[in-house]
């Protein structure tokens, strides 16, 4: 389901995965096999979920890597759409004409 203004996926990691377990960022980073700085950047919205991180999150907290990457994609698209007036494009063709 697409959200108009989705939260940064790092916020979801913090609020829905790390905090309910009573983990510190350092403890969660150790369990995920990443540096404290890498996880801190993610949960504070300074970094996104990479394919590798999506696998780590999937193994640690469940769900699938695709779900984690989907959250990241929705967030990234929503951020890009906030500046669509800055994106200048001339239409080339419609999708159905290209896919044939």
List the model feature ranges, each with a label.
Residues 35, 46, 61, 72-75:
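The DNA-recognition helices of helix-turn-helix-type DNA-binding domains
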